[in-house]
Structure formats: C-alpha cells, structure tokens
Amino acid sequence: MLFVDIAKAFDKIWHDGLLSKMMRLGFSDQLIKIILSYLNSREFRVRVENSLSTPRPILSGVPQGSILGPKLFNLYINGIPETAEVHLAMYADDTAIFTQNIYNHNIIEWLQNYVIRLKTWLKDWKIKVNASKSAFSLRDSGASETSRMSIFLISLSTGLLNINT
C-alpha cells in the first residue's frame, strides 16, 4: 500500500487547470465564470511591523475553510489515474493506493508501474507530493505476525518506488 500526501493541496490548485477540467466535464459557462470570479478576486498583503505591502493577487489555490474549497479540490483531482490492479481510497489530500496478490513481486511491480503513471499525472496537473508524509507499506500474509508490516519511504519526484530495507 502507498500512502500519498499532497503538499499544500488547497493552496496549490492550478486555476487554469481547474477551469479546463470543469469545461471538459460539461459545467455551464455561467458556473465557470462564477468560479473564475471566486478564484480571481482574492488577494493578499504582507505586514512587517508597521509596514503593509500593496495588494498582490493570489494566483493558485482555493480558500481553505470554505464550503466550496473541498469541492473544487475534488474536481481538480478528478481523473487521477486508475488501473485494474491498483485501487485508490481518497480523503481530502490524503490518498491510499493499494493492491493485493499472493506474490509480493507482483504487488511491487504493479505499484511501481502505477507510481510512474501517477508521477506524470501529478506533473501535468502541477501537484506536488509531501514525501515526508508519504510511505509504502508491504504486508506479507505468509510472514509471522511480528514481521508482517514493513514501511518504506517513497519518491514520487523520481518516479521510483524506493524500497530501502
């Protein structure tokens, strides 16, 4: 099983990509314009002691804590690759990618192939993975109870499932 955490998920949503996805999914032009207005009308300022910067536009992300933010995030990650051998369980920006087989080498091969596909998709959609919160776990049903679970770090930046024992 792979546990993948998307880095700054709500802050990094690529606006043009989200709007493009909404168009491909058949959202009405009127709704897309409303969402565009919602996303583009945000700005920020920086205060250092008594000095306040001029307003700057926020060019990516969706407002956290809003009702619409999680729904827009779900739309944005719609289309994450799926295969017959590999399954996904997602909650917000956390994803569990899992498979099962009696042979560990099949599991590792399927997950490795999936990681390569996922890496391309993540790059295309400008999504980064938080490597420090992502891991690989292999449960061997034939092993003794004390040695069934192994946790490894994964590297989606290289597209490799790094299994270091």
Regions found by a protein language model. Give the residues of each.
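Residues immediately flanking
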Residues: 4-6, 94, 101, 141
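Mobile genetic element proteins and their domesticated derivatives, centered on retroelements
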Residues: 5, 22, 35, 46, ...
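Short secondary-structure boundary/capping segments
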Residues: 16-21, 106, 145-146, 152-153
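Short amphipathic alpha-helical/adjacent loop interface patches that line ligand
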Residues: 39, 77, 115
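Short, conserved micro-motifs composed of acidic
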Residues: 50, 113, 129-164
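Active-site palm subdomain of RNA-directed nucleic acid polymerases
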Residues: 54, 70-99
